[in-house]
Amino acid sequence: MRILHTSDWHLGQNFYSKSRAAEHDAFLSWLLARAQEHEVDAIIVAGDIFDTGSPPSYARELYNRFVVQLQQTGCRLVVLAGNHDSVAMLNESRDILAFLQTTVVANAGCPPIELPRRDGTPGAIFCPVPFLRPRELVISQAGHSGREKQQQLLHAISDYYQEQYQQACALRGDRPLPVIASGHLTTVGASKSDAVRDIYIGTLDAFPAQHFPPADYIALGHIHRAQVVGGCEHIRYSGSPLPLSFDETGKAKSVHLVSFSDGRLSAVETLEVPVTQPLAVIKGDLAAITAQLEQWRGVEQDPPVWLDIEITTEEYLHDIQRQIQALTEDLPVEVLLVRRSREQREKILLNAQRETLSELKVEEVFERRLALTEIDDEKRARLHELFAHTLHTLTAEDENA
């Protein structure tokens, strides 16, 4: 039995006003080829197949086309909902996709299922655990402390997994079949990136790995960096196939090819996803940034590299942005983000705490507030325009009063 474990596709993501359609299309074509090459029996997508609950039409088209193409290979598809996914939207096509060897599990309550091999013989028992919404598991009661609510949710998730595992064992009987489980949540010690949202805000920070049942493999989603959980080789995050924030650059993206034999886990191979849209982060003062930009001088690069430029000086971002624009005009790069480093933002905030509003001009207050916000050039220019117009209007009113 072979499965491909993947997650966090985030189809339809808008990346600083840029579409990821071409990247996702290339990834799905690559994934389809790997499923055929390795004669995979099932692909498990552990949540966040879409980036929003109302994905654009092209994202739905990519999803539906992949289902049809995969069905023609004899490989099954299991789609679990993540915290970004809409239960209602996924359930819209669930019954139709079932005829195309695709199982969609959008919410809690789905019992374990049998995953067949390509030849139709039983291959594994699967516990299809999607993102578990607190309202599906616990009843909120007035008067409970934050600690009590945290423990209540922790026990509810643990109990749900144990119940799934017991049902899976009953379904397996004495057959030598592996038990596979899924999940879409943060585990204790997992390394997160900027694009990962907290999903149990105010109740549960992370789920302890020791509370998972003794399944042969646990395919997790939600964390965008591929990693083993708690030193347990059979509990893994596949990570996202694309970098979903600039702080995810520099590390390869992948899916896991998981093999079972004699009812047990036998091997996990990491398959690296090819890069179709390069991203890069450069940091420093203007001189350092100028030097780093030279690495693309004379390079033929298509598509252009998407850049995040982090400024480590106290100069006005607006002035630096104009200089960076001039520096990059003839380079195969596209600057999506210019921002201050976190250290500089904290320093500005600290200095601001020692000042009063009466010491600052209105324009300075606006610029400092803008410096703390990560937005693209187009929005920044629009905000400057709106601010200037508003200030002019107010000044004119004062003069005419």
Task: Mark where each language-model region is.
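Short, surface-exposed connector motifs at secondary-structure boundaries
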Residues: Q71-V79, P303-W306
